[in-house]
Structures are given as structure tokens and as C-alpha cells.
Amino acid sequence: MIITTTDVIQGSEVEEYLGIVTAEVVYGSNALRDFFAGIRDIIGGRTGSYEELFKQGQEEAIAELEKRARRMGANAVVGIEIDTGTINVDEKGALLLITAIGTAVKLA
């Protein structure tokens, strides 16, 4: 399956637009990781634990997007966008939300 951020796939023609397809991944916060990320932020540098979490979340969201698109009969997803956000649970933590959205299509 082709999954791309572009609306056009060079050398391919869209036979049918099947609709919008979305996928979401939600992670709970980890107090220990948050603590060390906070220290790293104070002294400078990158927070590798969060970078890895974002990378993993994006990969999982794209995999789920592909699975849902296949169920719609698609062989490609065009115009995908990945977004991140947080959902505040309480004063002690939040959830990390990663969403992927695109248009499921059938290529000729």
C-alpha cells in the first residue's frame, strides 16, 4: 500500500476516492520518564525518551491507518497528516494523543 503526504502519486491515477480515514494512538504519561525529561529540559539537550515515544506513536498510527484503509478497499492513502496533542487527565499527568488522517483511494 502506498501511503503519502502528497495528494498526487506520480505515474498513478486515482480510480476512486473512498473517503477520509483516521487512526489514533494514545499513551499514558510515565512519571519517571517525565522526571528525567524535566531535568534534561533544565540543563538543555534533547529528550530521547519522548522522541522515541513520538516515533513509535507515529509508526503505530500509520500502521492502523493502513489497516483501516484496507478494510475500506483502498490500495493507497493520500494527503496524510500526523498531529500530536495532549489530553489533561488531572494535575498529575496527561495522555499523549497521536492522530493520522488521510484520504483512502483506489488506484487504477
Swiss-Prot record:
Domain of life: Bacteria
Entries under InterPro entries matching the protein: UPF0145_dom_sf, UPF0145_YbjQ-like
SUPFAM superfamilies: YbjQ-like (SSF117782)
Pfam families, A to Z: YbjQ_1 (PF01906)
UniProt xrefs under HAMAP family: UPF0145
Similarity comment: Belongs to the UPF0145 family.
Protein name, per record: UPF0145 protein Tery_3795
Species the sequence originates in: Trichodesmium erythraeum (strain IMS101)
Taxonomic lineage from the root: Bacteria, Bacillati, Cyanobacteriota, Cyanophyceae, Oscillatoriophycideae
